């Protein structure tokens, strides 16, 4: 589904293809839940944390005092927007993966607007409601901006955004040429944003594969800006995922509520607890949902009962923390070179501007 904003209005185009896609996503969710709960080591893809409620809760997490990631990255974007724009060029098409509220990206858009540059922004997210809210807000701030919001996952979102980019420049070409990486520069540059340390949710080898897939869609004059959470004192890390207000608890437990809503589960949320800790050996935060007691859960869509012992857990998310050397190695292994790095004074967070090598 695409939302094309014009003036202050939002038009949503839905069709049979969209309905089929939604059914496919529910089937995929059900299948993954079935595999997870039947396994000895229960683990679900963290993307399932981000339904409508999960996305709203995550935006609240970003406002918590313990969650330094959002405000640190935002300060880097605000401070270095002139440098980023100078390196990338003023004639850019900004594509954001997992855009969420787009609050950080608005800082970059504000600088572009102050320089009288045209704004072309393509937020990609799996939450329709978040896209609607964020794009309406951006249009009120930047009434002349060209914003096309794309409801999609990462894998197909970039392709769809690239096609829309071509249309903004009057470029025409066959669909199978959109992804082709070559040395022919367009009249504009694409800047793909992958912020919020979302790269940390990927396993190390999967992170390489993912960035390689992005690299394959870029021309030599395109760029990728990635946010990395850096390795730091363990107490700072664990506090960020165990906020005193308990928002992260609700965010994690919402996954069980989602299974109840969408798949007819009968999880009793009070019988599970949120547990997040720092795995020193793997340099990652792990999030789990731990059963407080011996229990059985029935899921109607699967027509199955699943047993949990006291202490059994569902592994819901990893968040890897990087060193600067690991960032350099990841970029090289993925077919990128580091054009510029931006790090805060505490060296808690890093933004790397990458270009195809």
What are these regions (language model features)?
Residues 101-116:
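Conserved SAM-binding loop of SAM-dependent methyltransferases across substrates and taxa
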Residues 91-100:
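Conserved class I S-adenosyl-L-methionine
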Residues 208-220:
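A short glycine-rich, Lys/Arg-flanked "PGG" loop and its adjoining helix->strand segment in the class I
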Residues 188-208:
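A short SAM/SAH-binding and catalytic strip from SAM-dependent methyltransferases
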Residues 236-320, 328-334:
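Substrate-binding/catalytic lobe of Class I Rossmann-like enzymes that use SAM or dcSAM, i.e.
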